[in-house]
Amino acid sequence: VILFNVKESEQQEKEPEEVQAEVTQNPETMTQTAESIEDKYKVFDTMSEDWGSDDLEGFVFYDLPEQYADKGYFPEKMQIYTRCLCKQYDVPYALVLAIIEQESGYEFDKTGDGGQSKGYMQIYEKWHTDRMQNLGCTDLMNPYQNVRVGIDFLSYLLKKYGTIQDTLAAYNYGEKGAREYLWSNGVYVYSYNTAIIQRMKEIEEVVGK
């Protein structure tokens, strides 16, 4: 910790009221902030909304849990798109929501592991270049492309391993990692897949299967 000694006469710290007054009196700053926020969410306008209307009978929109409402964002158009993909791939919708909650807290622009894992489903591009190419996806920070790649991967894992438990282990560790660090040591149930399966069941009570 570096400490600086500042003479009392040189201190420029302002009282909270002064700072608030400056912010309030600076409409240009407020406009720039509003524009930057608006720009951030423009990515959700990159997808047509004329798909999936025939598949939404009984669909229930999901309200984010309170602890994720501040930073998380999962608008209705994103929910519809995700639900349609899940039906197309035969992947449980509640499972995808539980994974998104665990991985990113519904933050579509979240990055982790030094920027390597990206988006809602925290996908590593280096492990999914072929999958992305096959799906025509080029940007994992685009929420629509992110969930498409993630759901496609989940579909592959579910078909290969047969259980949600093992699918989640392979999703979390990678297939090779799950074999080497979990299954070869007799570990099939652990904190990650247990937590997500529990949340999946809770979410199913709200949105259905």
What label would you give each PLM region?
Residues L3-Y81:
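N-terminal export signals and maturation junctions of secreted/periplasmic proteins
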Residues M47-K209:
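Catalytic glycan-binding domains that act on GlcNAc-containing polysaccharides
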